[in-house]
Amino acid sequence: MERNQRKVYTGRVVSDKMDKTITVLVETYKKDRLYGKRVKYSKKFKAHDENNSAKIGDIVRIQETRPLSKDKHFRLVEIVEEAVII
């Protein structure tokens, strides 16, 4: 699979407690087959963060990669928006 054909998702970091790993919540919409209403659903992905640069609440872009561990199949591409700490 070529590098440009790999899946790219944008989501919010919900956990950064692991070393060099973040958990990203990706929210998408599906259209209900019967009623046509848009239904929001979410999925969590573990992604490799080499420099531990992403923090909780950041909006990040992740890309599919080779399996790095049992659960980790994505890597951090960029931090789109940093979280505002109040």
Swiss-Prot record:
Specify one Pfam family: Ribosomal_S17
**Classification via InterPro entries:** NA-bd_OB-fold, Ribosomal_uS17, Ribosomal_uS17_bact/chlr, Ribosomal_uS17_CS
- Protein keywords: Ribonucleoprotein, Ribosomal protein, RNA-binding, rRNA-binding
Which Gene Ontology terms describe the biological processes this protein takes part in?
Answer: translation
Query: Which SUPFAM superfamilies does the record associate with it?
Result: Nucleic acid-binding proteins
Q: Would you tell me the Gene Ontology cellular component terms?
A: cytosolic small ribosomal subunit
GO molecular function terms here? rRNA binding; structural constituent of ribosome
Highest taxon in the source lineage: Bacteria
Record-stated family = Belongs to the universal ribosomal protein uS17 family.
HAMAP family tied to this protein: Ribosomal_uS17_B
The name under which this protein is listed is: Small ribosomal subunit protein uS17
